[in-house]
Amino acid sequence: MKFFLDTANVDEIREANALGVISGVTTNPSLIAKEGRDFIEVVKEITQIVDGPISAEVISDDSEGMIREARELAKIHKNIVIKIPMTAEGLKAVNVLSKEGIKTNVTLIFTANQALLAARAGATYVSPFVGRLDDINTDGLQIIEDIVTIFNNYDIDTEIITASVRHPIHVLQAAKLGAHIATVPYKVLMQMVKHPLTDAGIERFKEDWRKAGLKI
């Protein structure tokens, strides 16, 4: 499984990228707005930090507007992936953009049928939202299992990005189910790094080392 960082905060991206575990970044209008900075400026800066797919989302609701915005965003950097919402207009846009060689990430997916349609329209990635499904008392990870099964059945190349990740268990289960990617908030990534027994073990080693009076 690959890891993308789900944020528009460049400081978080720098910190995570230094770990050597991040393969890309996903952003959305809400994350960009949270930073209070110019959209294009933020996206450009991210492309200078991470050498991998950077998802930037269109704002228009109609396919023509989506296509126009996507073409402009794609000019920023070769690693830009266009996030398109899972709507009929979105599928029309993906169909056109895929034929132009522009990579797309179809977002706000909540059913396996939506993922299948997006893949057939030419999406490079699909992003099922597991956390938001959990929020409405639905098993969010079931959608991952369903999409993985369907894509494997028909040799579909579209990659599955597990999105709306709320905690490390989401990541673990998605990895076991065969999702290609998990896009995680910085907080969740740090939770994955740490364990209290690891911290306790380090302190024990340090204490034993000090007692023995050893040096490197």
Swiss-Prot record:
> Where is the protein localized?
Cytoplasm
Q: Which family does it belong to?
A: Belongs to the transaldolase family. Type 3B subfamily.
Predominantly, its location class is cytoplasm
- What's its EC? 2.2.1.2
Recite the UniProt keywords alphabetically. Answer: Cytoplasm, Pentose shunt, Schiff base, Transferase
* Record-linked InterPro entries: Aldolase_TIM, TAL/FSA, Transaldolase_3B, Transaldolase_3B/F6P_aldolase, Transaldolase_AS, TSA/FSA_arc/bac
GO CC term, one of those recorded: cytoplasm
Name this protein carries in UniProt: Probable transaldolase
For the keyword Transferase, the answer is yes
Biological or metabolic pathway of the protein: Carbohydrate degradation; pentose phosphate pathway; D-glyceraldehyde 3-phosphate and beta-D-fructose 6-phosphate from D-ribose 5-phosphate and D-xylulose 5-phosphate (non-oxidative stage): step 2/3
Annotated GO molecular function terms are: aldehyde-lyase activity; transaldolase activity
Taxonomic lineage of this organism? Bacteria, Bacillati, Bacillota, Clostridia, Thermoanaerobacterales
